[in-house]
């Protein structure tokens, strides 16, 4: 039983091995919208913060970029760049850091749903 628990913990933590640079190598998905950066930020943050994933409430942080902001909702394991463009806002989602052996796409699907609902 003890070996089984150790194995499950190791599998669960396997997705946590990515660092900031690894996560940012490839975006998960990119969107464009005619909404302003401020509208997207105001819409997305409450949606991201409403998810708990059976743990403590998420507290999305906002970090400045040269032409926008980065939203960091889950302990730095995923990022959403909101970049000002002439047509509105480009939304770039980096979600690979949230993948795990047990739930490979769960967090990504929830975040993409939140993004799409704000577009």
Stretches found by the model and what they are:
Residues 1-4:
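Positively charged n-region of N-terminal signal peptides that target proteins for export
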Residues 12-15:
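C-terminal motif of bacterial Sec signal peptides marking the signal peptidase cleavage site
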């Amino acid at each position: 039983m003890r070996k089984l628990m150790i194995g499950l913990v190791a599998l669960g933590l396997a997705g946590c091995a990515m660092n900031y640079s690894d996560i940012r190598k490839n975006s998960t998905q990119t969107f464009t919208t005619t909404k302003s950066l401020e509208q997207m930020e105001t819409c997305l943050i409450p949606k991201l913060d409403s998810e708990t994933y059976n743990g403590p409430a998420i507290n999305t942080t906002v970090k400045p970029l040269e032409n926008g902001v980065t939203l960091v909702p889950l302990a730095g394991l995923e990022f959403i760049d909101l970049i000002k463009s002439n047509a509105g806002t480009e939304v770039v989602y980096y979600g690979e850091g949230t993948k795990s052996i047990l739930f490979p796409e769960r967090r990504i699907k929830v975040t993409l749903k939140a993004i799409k609902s704000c577009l």
